[in-house]
UniProtKB/Swiss-Prot annotation:
HAMAP family: Ycf3 (MF_00439). This is Photosystem I assembly protein Ycf3. It comes from Trichodesmium erythraeum (strain IMS101). Keywords: Membrane, Photosynthesis, Repeat, Thylakoid, TPR repeat. It is a peripheral membrane protein. Essential for the assembly of the photosystem I (PSI) complex. May act as a chaperone-like factor to guide the assembly of the PSI subunits. The keyword Calcium does not apply. InterPro entries: PSI_Ycf3_assembly, TPR-like_helical_dom_sf, TPR_rpt, Ycf3/AcsC/BcsC/TPR_MFPF.
Length: 173
């Protein structure tokens, strides 16, 4: 049974009904509609913590979707799942693929920065300050890019950049 037929959450049901109406009204081809249905089911499964099911749906959507912008969001969500599972290398691969399809995706840049910052903290805990600084510098570069695309977001990152001396601006927003 498709996920959309067994959804008990009112908000998810409402989203599904609206998405189905939009799909029926918009002039798109059947492949695009099918890709969106898989994407929608992937988002629903991901929201429920059903990551294996979400990945299956996202991979199906990815096989069907041609639009680079839409592909970027599918790839981004796959990256989110890998990051949630602690699979940071895989998450980085998918975030970078998302950026190849859509370079103006600050959330992917932010998540890459978060992974490098995490790695920096881990290196710092083990006393490896050289690696820690390298990871922190990489995090800073990605956060600067994310902030340049979304200057009113990522306030904590902006503060971190400023307090660590990695910011070349006084205030980003």
């Amino acid at each position: 049974m498709p996920r959309t037929q067994r959804n008990d959450n009112f908000i998810d049901k409402s989203f599904t009904v609206m998405a189905d109406l939009i799909l029926k009204l918009l002039p798109t081809n059947n492949q695009a509609k099918e890709a969106f249905a898989y994407y929608r089911d992937g988002m629903s499964a991901q929201a429920d913590g059903e990551y294996a099911e979400a990945l299956e749906n996202y991979y199906e959507a990815l096989n069907l979707e041609d639009d680079p912008n839409d592909r970027s969001y599918i790839l981004y969500n796959i990256g989110l799942i890998h990051a949630s599972n602690g699979e940071h290398d895989q998450a980085l691969e998918y975030y970078h693929q998302a950026l190849e399809n859509n370079p103006r995706m600050p959330q992917a840049l932010n998540n890459i920065a978060v992974i490098f910052h995490y790695r920096g903290e881990k290196a710092k805990e083990t006393g490896n300050s050289r690696d820690a600084n390298s990871y922190f510098d990489q995090a800073a570069e990605y956060w600067k890019q994310a902030i340049s695309l979304a200057p009113n977001n990522y306030i904590e990152a902006q503060n971190w950049l400023k307090t660590t001396g990695r910011s070349n601006k006084e205030v980003f927003f």
